[in-house]
Each structure stands twice: as structure tokens, then as C-alpha cells.
Curated annotation (Swiss-Prot):
This is Holliday junction branch migration complex subunit RuvB. Its main location: cytoplasm. Keywords: ATP-binding, Cytoplasm, DNA damage, DNA recombination, DNA repair, DNA-binding, Hydrolase, Nucleotide-binding. Mg(2+) binds at T68. It comes from Syntrophomonas wolfei subsp. wolfei (strain DSM 2245B / Goettingen). Residues 184-254 are annotated as: Small ATPAse domain (RuvB-S). The RuvA-RuvB-RuvC complex processes Holliday junction (HJ) DNA during genetic recombination and DNA repair, while the RuvA-RuvB complex plays an important role in the rescue of blocked DNA replication forks via replication fork reversal (RFR). RuvA specifically binds to HJ cruciform DNA, conferring on it an open structure. The RuvB hexamer acts as an ATP-dependent pump, pulling dsDNA into and through the RuvAB complex. RuvB forms 2 homohexamers on either side of HJ DNA bound by 1 or 2 RuvA tetramers; 4 subunits per hexamer contact DNA at a time. Its EC number is 3.6.4.-.
């Protein structure tokens, strides 16, 4: 198993430069998320006709679905520069004040992982978002006084993978909220073909479809797999990626037809083989596969839940009928004939 998961939806070191070269710059180039695109286009057009700054935007959804890309596209569409930072990087209220007071009129401020903003920093954000002002306390004790600074109109775009962790006062100040969902295999295939054209990779539709089917519904994963399959095509093939080459390369990378890697299968096999299908507690499961509990719950479980391979119950994790069938295990008696959504 490779040290860094090829199918991780989180950004790996090599992804940043590669993604920048293939990121779309306009809504017309952005593939998928049709409802979100339609709504965003309406909001941008309306703000332009009113000659106002676009309302503040909250982008939520699993990692790797294009929240940062969409933020950059919004800035391009409104014709304003974008300034990027992240929640953990803004440690003190003064850090945020410095950013806000240096914004140009209409500029877009993008804060990734906005759910990780310090609460003291967050309180500075409230009047800035509502009234375009910030209050700075000067001095200490009885001599302290508040200085109010006016800010130019700006648009805040916040991105989060965990919208439930945002405080209600902050969440309620976003006038526009968009949730990005997993992509269909057809959409991913189009994304892969577009990336291949930009990167000058020889790839046919069947090869793109095979890569898309194992990309976990995530463009970041799809683009990463494309680059790894390209390596196999260059070294072990003739440089061209077709269905057979893509299928063989992905099998060499130990990524199956559902997009599961070695650790995904180890988790399912542990639940089925060691714990009779469950239920099994998270800590016990993590110990059985030599992994951290938080890593299991944050990195591996979401996709297994999406596929319906595991269930979370009050007593622990259970493998479903789909997991038994996928791994080729005989069904337990209480699973025989029962689907995940069976009434029985």
C-alpha cells in the first residue's frame, strides 16, 4: 500500500501545482454541480445589475469537490481579485483586521476551513459581514476605547467540509449557501478528458470511463488517478491510455471497481472476518487495523457509508449485505435476502 492514499480526497503535496494548471476559470468551463452553477450565475448577474457586491457565499461539501475552484470562478465572474486564506491561519483578531482593512472595493475574500476560525476572530467578522465595519479595542483596562473602522464593500466566500461546526451567528450571515455533492461517473469522465487535453495525455473515452468509475465521485481523486495511470502508460505501455491499460494500472494500484483501496477493504474485512459483521466499536475496529480512530471516522467511513457498505448503529459499525457481496463473503443468516433499506 502506498504511503499517501491515492484516493484520498484531501490535498496531497503534488496536487496543488497540478490542479492549478487544469482548474476551470469560468462557470462555462466548470463541469458538474449544475444546480449550484445555475444559482450562482443568477446571483452574480443580479448583483452586477444592481451595481452591488455579491452577497457573502458559504460553500460546503466533502473535500475535493471543487469549493476552492468555484470560489476563484466566482471572483473571475464578478471581475474582482480574490484573496485566499484559511481559518487556522487567522489566529488573532488583529490578523483578520489586517486582512479586511487592506481589501479593495468589491474584492473577494476566500477563507478555507472557515469552521476552524477562532471564536474571538469570528466575532470581528460579524459587523464586517453585515455593516462593512470592524471595531478595534485600543488600550487596556479603564483607558480602553473602541475604534470603529469602515471597510469597503467586499464578498466573503467561506468553504467548509463540516458546516455543522459553524456557529449559528456566523452561518446566518451568509446570504448564499451552496452545497457541493459527489459527481456522477459521466461528469468525472468529462473532467478527466478535459484534464487529459490540457496535460496532453493520450486518453480515449473508455479509459476515462474506467478511471472515473474508481474515483469516488471526487474530481481531485480523478485527476490524481489520471496522472498515475499516465505513468503506467508511459513506462509499461505505448503512452496511450485505453480501457485495458487503465484497468490494469488501477489494479496495480490496488484500487478496485468501486474505488476502494487496501485500507478500505481491511476495514470491511475486519468487521466481517474478525467481528462477525458487527456491531463493533470504533476504537476496537481502529485497533484491529492499526489505525487511529479519528482517521477511520473522518477519512475512510464517509465513502463506505455513501456506498452503503457499512452502517453506524448505537452499538457500533456493522457491515451490510453490499459489503459481503462485494468482498465475496457468504451472507450471514440475518442478512440473507435483506437489502440495506429493507423493511424487515
Amino acid at each position: 500500500m502506498l504511503d499517501e492514499r491515492l484516493i484520498s480526497s484531501h490535498l496531497l503535496d503534488e496536487d496543488d501545482n497540478n490542479e492549478n494548471s487544469i482548474r476551470p476559470g469560468r462557470l462555462s468551463e466548470y463541469i458538474g454541480q449544475e444546480k449550484v452553477k445555475e444559482n450562482v450565475e443568477v446571483f452574480i448577474t443580479a448583483a452586477r445589475e444592481r451595481k452591488e457586491s455579491l452577497d457573502h457565499v458559504l460553500l460546503s461539501g466533502p473535500p475535493g469537490l471543487g469549493k476552492t475552484t468555484l470560489a476563484s470562478i466566482i471572483a473571475n465572474e464578478v471581475g474582482k481579485p480574490i484573496r485566499k486564506t484559511s481559518g487556522p491561519a487567522i489566529e488573532r483578531p488583529g490578523d483578520l483586521a489586517a486582512i479586511l482593512t487592506n481589501l479593495e472595493p468589491g474584492e473577494v475574500l476566500f477563507i478555507d476551513e472557515i469552521h476552524r476560525l477562532n471564536r474571538n476572530v469570528e466575532e470581528i467578522m460579524y459587523p464586517a459581514m453585515e455593516d462593512y465595519v470592524i471595531d478595534i479595542i485600543i488600550g487596556k483596562g479603564p483607558a480602553a476605547r473602541t475604534l470603529r473602522l469602515d471597510l469597503p464593500p467586499f464578498t466573503l466566500i467561506g468553504a467548509t467540509t463540516r458546516p455543522g461546526l459553524l456557529s449559528s451567528p456566523l452561518r446566518d450571515r451568509f446570504g448564499i449557501s451552496c452545497r457541493l455533492d459527489f459527481y456522477t461517473p459521466l461528469e468525472l469522465s468529462e473532467i478527466i478528458l478535459r484534464a487529459a487535453r490540457i496535460l496532453e495525455i493520450s486518453l480515449d473515452k473508455e479509459g476515462a470511463t474506467e478511471i472515473a468509475g474508481r474515483s469516488r465521485g471526487t474530481p481531485r481523486v480523478a485527476n490524481r488517478l489520471l496522472r498515475r495511470v499516465r505513468d503506467y502508460a508511459l513506462v509499461k505501455g505505448n503512452g496511450n491510455i485505453d480501457f485495458s491499460l487503465a484497468k490494469w494500472a488501477l489494479e496495480m494500484l490496488e484500487i478496485d471497481e468501486c474505488g476502494l483501496d487496501v485500507m478500505d477493504r481491511m476495514i470491511l474485512e475486519a468487521i466481517i472476518g474478525k467481528f462477525s459483521g458487527g456491531p463493533v466499536g470504533l476504537d476496537t475496529l481502529a485497533a484491529s487495523v492499526s489505525e487511529e480512530s479519528d482517521t477511520i471516522s473522518d477519512v475512510y467511513e464517509p465513502y463506505l457509508l455513501k456506498l452503503g457498505f457499512i452502517q453506524k448503529t448505537p452499538r457500533g459499525r456493522m457491515a451490510t449485505e453490499h459489503a459481503y457481496r462485494h468482498l465475496g463473503y457468504p451472507l450471514k443468516g440475518n442478512l440473507e435476502g435483506k437489502g440495506l433499506f429493507s423493511d424487515a
